[in-house]
Regions:
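N-terminal beta1-alpha1-beta2 module of alpha/beta enzyme domains
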Residues: 1-91, 193-194
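A cross-family glycoside hydrolase active-site/sugar-binding cleft signature
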Residues: 6-8, 72, 97-99, 128-130, ...
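Internal, glycine-rich beta/alpha segment that forms the wall or movable "lid"
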Residues: 16-17, 37-45, 109-204
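The substrate-binding groove and active-site-proximal loops of carbohydrate-active enzymes
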Residues: 41-47, 70-71, 97-104, 144-148
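Hydrophobic residues within beta-strands of alpha/beta enzymes
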Residues: 61, 69, 96, 125-127
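Acidic, glycine-rich active-site loops and adjacent beta-strand->loop/helix elements
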Residues: 74-76, 100-108, 131-135
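Alpha-helix-loop-beta-strand connector modules within alpha/beta enzyme cores
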Residues: 80-98, 153, 157, 164
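Conserved strand-to-helix beginnings and helix N-cap segments that scaffold or border functional pockets
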Residues: 80-81, 107-111
């Protein structure tokens, strides 16, 4: 058995300085002069911004032999797929484990986005499919399904993704999703489907 080590990229701020310090390139500085992410704060005095900091962390993980990096789906953080797509161009071998809720994307949208990412990155996307979290926060963000139903939906979601990936004309009818002839074609269909993983603490 091979053991792999994965780093974690901070999508909700990270800094050696106290919150609010002008030198905070780890971002999530809540002060009015805070960085926008791509552009450094004018009060810092240089052009090193939050996305540059994340690039350094990703490159350091790659140089030090990590197999990949986890990008968590923090409720108020940056979106993992967007950030990892930017960082894929800054690295050569590092895999990106992007956490997401199936309810945030349609199966077709997720399939097309993942295939595009795989083409751009050379097949370095890993999906961390999550269904859990705070019920209150999930409802606040538009998630209508209760705990058990989210797991059933996730199974259907992945059935559709695999079907779209393997067929140019895929048909499916489930409880939450239906497809009538969709599927990847051309170069997108030749991209490798992401490794899919999931973790949780549910006891039901």
């Amino acid at each position: 058995m091979t053991i792999e080590f994965f780093a974690r990229l901070p999508l909700h701020g990270e800094t050696q300085y106290i919150p609010g310090d002008n030198r905070n390139r780890g971002d999530w500085n809540r002060q009015p002069h805070a960085s926008t992410g791509a552009v450094s704060s004018s009060e810092v005095g240089d052009d090193f911004a939050y996305v540059d900091y994340l690039s350094q962390v990703a490159r350091a993980a790659e140089i030090n032999g990590f197999s990949g990096a986890l990008l968590v789906n923090a409720p108020f953080g940056d979106e993992p797929w967007i950030v990892s797509a930017a960082l894929a161009r800054e690295t050569k071998r590092l895999r990106f484990v992007d956490a997401f809720h199936p309810g945030h994307f349609s199966p077709w949208q997720a399939t097309q986005m993942a295939a595009s990412f795989q083409r751009i990155s050379g097949g370095r996307l890993v999906w961390n499919v999550i269904q859990g979290g705070s019920d209150g926060l999930l409802r606040a963000n538009g998630e209508p399904l209760p705990h058990d139903e989210r797991y059933v939906r996730a199974i259907e979601f992945l059935d559709l993704v695999k079907g779209f990936w393997a067929n140019e004309s895929f048909h499916y009818k489930g409880r939450y999703y239906e497809a009538n002839g969709g599927g990847l074609r051309g170069p997108l269909a030749r991209a490798p489907i992401p490794t899919i993983c999931s973790a949780g603490t549910s006891d039901g």
